[in-house]
């Protein structure tokens, strides 16, 4: 099984194997998840100061903020063209 990496915007790359969910930041429960992650020190802000459009939740309980739409991240996850690298273990 290889490690799949996906671009989440501005040159930031995340391991696709570790993703649990890609969601929109608009709802109150997601805003609470973001605040709780910030309080625990588990929040990664990859927006470069831009508006948060996608919230990525990983299996390690890290919460990653991205300025790319959730649909775009999901599309990059599902296509081979946007996979940055595959490494065989």
Swiss-Prot record:
Q: Sorted alphabetically, which Pfam families does this protein's record hold? A: RemA-like
PANTHER family, per database record? REGULATORY PROTEIN SSL2874-RELATED, REGULATORY PROTEIN TM_1690-RELATED
Which family does the entry's similarity section mention? Belongs to the RemA family.
What is the recorded name of this protein?
Putative regulatory protein CLL_A1210
Q: Which species is this UniProt entry from?
A: Clostridium botulinum (strain Eklund 17B / Type B)
